[in-house]
């Protein structure tokens, strides 16, 4: 899924 870091950078994770 797509999650966002606290600093606001887009981070793509596969669950």
Curated annotation (Swiss-Prot):
Keyword flag Flavoprotein: no
Where in the cell does this protein reside? Plastid, Chloroplast
Presence of keyword S-adenosyl-L-methionine: no
Any GO CC annotation of this UniProt entry: chloroplast
Q: Which UniProt keywords apply?
A: Calvin cycle, Carbon dioxide fixation, Chloroplast, Photorespiration, Photosynthesis, Plastid
| Gene Ontology BP, a term | reductive pentose-phosphate cycle
- What residues form the membrane-spanning segments? none
Q: Say where the protein is mainly found.
A: plastid
- Miscellaneous information on this protein: The basic functional RuBisCO is composed of a large chain homodimer in a 'head-to-tail' conformation. In form I RuBisCO this homodimer is arranged in a barrel-like tetramer with the small subunits forming a tetrameric 'cap' on each end of the 'barrel'.
The task this protein performs is described as:
RuBisCO catalyzes two reactions: the carboxylation of D-ribulose 1,5-bisphosphate, the primary event in carbon dioxide fixation, as well as the oxidative fragmentation of the pentose substrate. Both reactions occur simultaneously and in competition at the same active site. Although the small subunit is not catalytic it is essential for maximal activity.
Family under the similarity heading: Belongs to the RuBisCO small chain family.
Subunit structure of this entry?
Heterohexadecamer of 8 large and 8 small subunits.
Query: Under what name is this protein listed?
Result: Ribulose bisphosphate carboxylase small subunit, chloroplastic
């Amino acid at each position: 899924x797509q999650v966002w870091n606290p600093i606001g950078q887009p981070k793509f994770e596969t669950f």
